[in-house]
Amino acid sequence: MMTIMDRSVLYQINSLEKPQKISGFLKEKGYSRQNLVDLRKNEQAICLNGTYVHMNHMLAEGDVLTVWIRETDNSGQIRPVKLPFVIVYEDEDLLVINKPAGMPVHPSRGNPENSLGNALAWYFKEQGVPFVFRCINRLDRDTTGALILAKNPLSAAILSVQMKKRQILRTYLALVDGLLPDSGTINAPIARMEGSVITR
């Protein structure tokens, strides 16, 4: 079990190819535009060699840069409900869980208390940590599998870009009916079942 409210990231500046501001350095590290906007709002978010500085400060070789990622959001509208789920992996930045089949990811008007969001709200409430629901990937209600959640704004930005660039690989297992050859490739879209917007 691991929790995190504010995340600090330390960078040792060993070498620089060219003179660079802190803002440019962080952008190269995967910080989103919104991440940088949030950092600029906090005068104690950027610490360089033990001194708080602004984002336009120039870096030099040998600098030690510490960035404080503050949690400002909250998914307090999601009702905490004690529901079972399995944690596959957890660290300061992300949580990977095995979503049970039959459980939707998000609560809805017709199902406000039996979703993964409710279960995670309970999980974080029990640890006294603000809950922000940041799903990186999606799974249908009846699909079980690994779901990635970002635990802070920086990891959300980095993981979202990786997902868009298809750098996060996903493998699906499916049940099929009938006799199939030992190997082969099906190169065709998976169509929806007639009369359904979910079943394929």
Give residue spans per PLM region:
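RNA pseudouridine synthases
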Residues: M2-R200
